[in-house]
Amino acid sequence: MKLALLPWILMLLSTIPGPGFTAGAQGSCSLRCGAQDGLCSCHPTCSGLGTCCEDFLDYCLEILPSSGSMMGGKDFVVQHLKWTDPTDGVICRFKESIQTLGYVDDFYQVHCISPLLYESGYIPFTISMDNGRSFPHAGTWLAAHPYKVSESEKSQLVNETHWQYYGTSDTRGNLNLTWDTSALPTPAVTIELWGYEETGKPYSGNWTSKWSYLYPLATNIPNTGFFTFTPKPASPQYQRWKVGALRISSSRNYPGEKDVRALWTNDHALAWHLGDDFRADSVAWARAQCLAWEALEDQLPNFLTELPDCPCTLAQARADSGRFFTDYGCDIEHGSVCTYHPGAVHCVRSVQASPRYGSGQQCCYTAAGTQLLTSDSTSGSTPDRGHDWGAPPYRTPPRVPGMSHWLYDVISFYYCCLWAPECPRYMKRRPSSDCRNYRPPRLASAFGDPHFVTFDGTSFSFSGNGEYVLLETTLSDLRVQGRAQPGRMPNGTQARGTGLTAVAVQEDNSDVIEVRLAGGSRVLEVLLNQKVLSFTEQNWMDLKGMFLSVAAQDKVSIMLSSGAGLEVGVQGPFLSVSILLPEKFLTHTRGLLGTLNNNPRDDFTLRNGQVLPLNASAQQVFQFGADWAVSNTSSLFTYDSWLLVYQFVYGPKHNPNFKPLFPDETTLSPSQTEDVARLCEGDRFCILDVMSTGSSSVGNATRIAHQLHQHRLKSLQPVVSCGWLPPPANGHKEGLRYLEGSVVRFSCNNGYSLVGPESSTCQADGKWSMPTPECQPGRSYTVLLSIIFGGLAIVALISIIYMMLHRRRKSNMTMWSSQP
């Protein structure tokens, strides 16, 4: 009887509303957030398990909003904590060193103001309610790159181009600024200019970054959400700042007061505040700045050798999502507004900064999928000395997100290309990478019932019920695990097929990310170190050892520091997962997704090294899958309900009592065969899933997932590149594509003649069929022919005139001799 009641007991336990607390427990979460020992728990999983200390939410804080710009000034409120006692002062301390003043509002809610930071990602903070004597309350704040927060959280430069070209050509007049007054509830505001600089010897210990308050544009003006002014040149002591941002804050604050509630503009080129010398001759001023940048750049280390080569095609760039990600400044999915790269439809950036110099790669592509190179056009992609997204450990040059990039790569572009005609100097020091050394990553996937396609191309099905090792690597201690659970038949009974319901990943000592279906639904839930994340504010997160992106409700992308990448998405009632591994992982993998070594024959390798043949029976393959079950000590999964605890912690990781439906155990009726053939279009995985679940929708989802895998695999096929081919001196070329089969044609300027081949073809061996020809001084064929025919015409004309004159003379002589 007790055994029969157990499933019902588990069901009731799993539906206990959270957060739950351990009744009567005397323990406290003061200074214990994350701890699981003691009489009660302060761990994030305690809410679902009902084991929390009674003061859990008072000390382990939830905040709203939970994120904001790294520029600071965001007011956030602590949820659940009500403070009715008198307080000497509220102090919020970020990263154990940066303190801001908080307050208690009229509703007894505690507030903090986020500080100005030089890094992005999750920032731990603590709160003191006794003016700094103790900090027992703890939480985390997500600091985001300024360009990745919503526009409503910033003040807006109306016609930003006008601001950044002010003083050039005939760009004059008023400048306008707007903001959302509800985001800054105060009757009067002050508008200030802040400047950013990095000082000290580059790449030394005294290289520092700093935001500085410069001067006010307006003080104590009504908070109307609009400000207009005519810029005047700044005083000489402020003109060394060329990059900065405006800050709007309450007029109650003293000038330049740090870390107060405020709205910032985007960082921008401060053309509008530069001196009279800039306004008198902006081209000469910018040229001098460009030459100075050029001289400094030539003294700095060469960062280009550290950068990865760009993918050869747009398809490769979009498919290689572990190493490259969309550049928000040129996104094909958002209208291809490519301000700095006209002619491009999409750009990507290398996800990880280079290890030594913190630099970044950029790759841009045309609508035809061809890479745009600076050697051919100023619209080409340009690498960055400072990665736009920054680089851990952040805080110091050139690793400050956004700002280091502005100083070393963007403002110099204004000097050389936008304000002065010196762009070749810039492009020489920021040349596009071609793709001769690019190697696409290797792809493996799992989807449907589930079905697996290994890195070496072996495909099989394994309907296990449990938690399994999808991938382990010895190169970087990368671990990817999957949880598979039974599906449901159309009549509600348990199917004899399973599917992935959770995927977890960790690399070395990185954070742990788990992606799962929430509560048996088709809604994705993402957990960071066993705590559920919210994506209502941010869809991009900088985490320890990885980046996380949620571009849609049904897909999560995880980019690891090694260059490996995962994409987890919803396909029907289950999850699908695709894993991308760079070539360096060759011979370093094991698990259900095989041994990556270009040899599919050893993909069914057991833990003990025994290898099953590729023609192993379905039952043997099932035993292979079961052998890769995880253990309690190695599991990356979160067990935050008693149902999960009893099933996967107290129970076996692989359920030996679950009997899947093997392909040879069932057949379809003729009518079913016809329906399935029409639905599945020959996809055997789709057919198997219709048979095991009785659901055509499940089969269709599997077919789509398989097609997506095949499409990505096709996009990632290696492409031969012959590299950039220059035009001849004093001539030009036709053709900007340098991949196998491409033809480049040559011609010469007037006054020069072509010596050598008229075209060259990129061959399969990566070499051009012909070298670039020469254009030698001399008359071109066109000019020569013109001279020849012109000379002949002149000779003919002289001959005609001579003949006419001769005839006239003869006629005159005849007339004279006939007179009397």
Swiss-Prot record:
Classification via Gene3D superfamilies: 4.10.410.20, Complement Module, domain 1
Transmembrane segments: 783-803
UniProt main location, coarse: membrane
Extracellular face residues: 23-782
Domain Sushi residues, every copy: 720-777
PROSITE patterns: AMOP (PS50856), SMB_1 (PS00524), SMB_2 (PS50958), SUSHI (PS50923), VWFD (PS51233)
Ranges per topology, Cytoplasmic: 804-820
Keyword rRNA processing included in the entry's annotation: no
Signal peptide positions (record): 1-22
Start and end residues of each AMOP domain: 282-430
PANTHER family, A to Z: MUCIN 4-RELATED (PTHR13802), SUSHI DOMAIN-CONTAINING PROTEIN 2 (PTHR13802:SF63)
Its biological purpose: May be a cytokine receptor for GPR15LG. May be a tumor suppressor; together with GPR15LG has a growth inhibitory effect on colon cancer cells which includes G1 cell cycle arrest. May play a role in breast tumorigenesis.
Stated name of the protein: Sushi domain-containing protein 2
Organism name: Mus musculus
Gene this chain is encoded by: Susd2
